[in-house]
Regions:
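N-terminal Rossmann-like NAD(P)+-binding domain of SDR-like oxidoreductases, especially those catalyzing
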Residues: 1-134
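NAD(P)-dependent short-chain dehydrogenase/reductase
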Residues: 116-191
């Protein structure tokens, strides 16, 4: 709650709770949703896939139904580059084939498809953003991610550099770049 702006109203509830979702959407007269509600640990998704199917996919289904029933026609979806799996081409283009290699990526791709069908059935506007590694924060430190345990690449690298973690494994050394590692585009949190 300390991360919520003082002028914002904080609601604690589940994306999978239809009644809760419709109450908030109606009370706040929401006209668009930014959908970040998903479990996102690749390793955990492989050992506990049902948790990911239930929250990520079923929860999104409930959200979309609530949006339809409340007349909310705009959604920005936080997806993942994990939907591509092992890319056939570098750099990866949005038009490249998707082939997730883990449950997390599979659920995110399914969520994208659900949102696309929501668009086709109800004329809703949407965009799915396929991030690679989320890193950084607003200069104030107010906007950004905090994980415990840390699971994201850049913070793990910083933990190694500061001696709080012994090592990091780097996978992929045969890309057509100066050091053999892949190159990624990025968007700044302030953009």
């Amino acid at each position: 709650r300390q991360d919520v702006h003082k002028d914002a109203t904080f609601y604690h509830g589940s994306i999978a709770d239809y009644r809760f979702m419709t109450e908030v959407l109606r009370k706040e007269k929401v006209d668009g949703v930014i959908h970040f509600a998903a479990y996102s640990l690749v390793g955990e998704s492989m050992t506990n896939p049902y948790k990911y199917y239930d929250n990520n996919m079923s929860g999104t289904n409930v959200l979309l139904k609530a949006m339809v029933d409340c007349g909310v026609n705009n959604i920005v979806f936080s997806s993942t580059a994990a939907t591509y799996g092992e890319a056939q081409n570098i750099p990866i283009l949005e038009t490249d084939p998707t082939n997730p290699t883990n449950v997390y990526g599979e659920t995110k791709l399914a969520m994208e498809r659900m949102i696309n069908w929501y668009h086709k059935a109800h004329g809703a506007n949407y965009v799915s953003l396929r991030y690679f590694n989320v890193a950084g924060a607003h200069p104030s430190g107010v906007i950004g991610e905090k994980h415990d345990p840390e699971t994201h690449l850049i913070p793990i690298i910083l933990q190694v550099a500061s001696g709080r973690r012994e090592a990091i494994n780097v996978f992929g050394d045969d890309y057509d770049t100066a050091d053999g590692t892949c190159i990624r585009d990025y968007i700044h949190v302030c953009d």
